[in-house]
Amino acid sequence: MNNILAIALGAAIGANLRYGIGLWAAQRFGTAWPYGTFIINLLGCLGIGLLLTLISTRLTLSEPVRLMLVTGLLGGFTTFSTFGYESFSLLSSGNWLPAIGYMVGSVVGGLIAVIIGVGLGRWFGG
C-alpha cells in the first residue's frame, strides 16, 4: 500500500472517531467545558504510548501500516489546534479556573496517559 494512501485512510478513520466521540461527549456532558477534546487527546496519548511501545518491542508492522496507525489514525484523531482554541475561548470569556483546569489537565493527563500506554505496551509486549 502506498504510504500516502495509508496515512489518508488512517486519518479518515481517526477524524471520524474524533467526530463521533465529540458528539457523544457533548450529548453526555454538555458543552460548557471541552470534554470531547479532552477525552480524545487523552485517548490519543494512551494510544500512541501503547502502539509505539508494542511496535518497538513486539509488533512487526510494515511501514504503510505503521504510518496508517500512528501518523494517520492517531494524527487524525487527536487535535492540538482545537485544544488551543478551546483554551483561548475559556480564557477570553473569563472562565479562568475551568481554562486552567483544562490546560493543566490536558498536559498532565496526556503525559500520564502516555506513561500508562507505554506500560501497557511493555506488559503486552512481554
Curated annotation (Swiss-Prot):
Any matching Pfam family: CRCB
Subcellular location: Cell membrane
Catalytic activity of the protein: fluoride(in) = fluoride(out)
Disulfides per UniProt: none
Entry keyword annotation includes Transmembrane: yes
Binding positions for Na(+) per the UniProt entry: 75, 78
Gene Ontology annotations of biological process type: cellular detoxification of fluoride; fluoride transmembrane transport
Annotated transmembrane regions: 4-24, 35-55, 68-88, 100-120
UniProt superkingdom: Bacteria
A GO-annotated cellular component: plasma membrane
Keywords from the UniProt entry: Cell membrane, Ion channel, Ion transport, Membrane, Metal-binding, Sodium, Transmembrane, Transmembrane helix, Transport
Topology of the protein relative to the lipid bilayer: Multi-pass membrane protein
Activity regulation note: Na(+) is not transported, but it plays an essential structural role and its presence is essential for fluoride channel function.
HAMAP family reported for this sequence: FluC
Membership in a protein family: Belongs to the fluoride channel Fluc/FEX (TC 1.A.43) family.
Protein name: Fluoride-specific ion channel FluC
The organism of origin for this protein: Chloroflexus aurantiacus (strain ATCC 29366 / DSM 635 / J-10-fl)
Gene that this polypeptide is encoded by: fluC
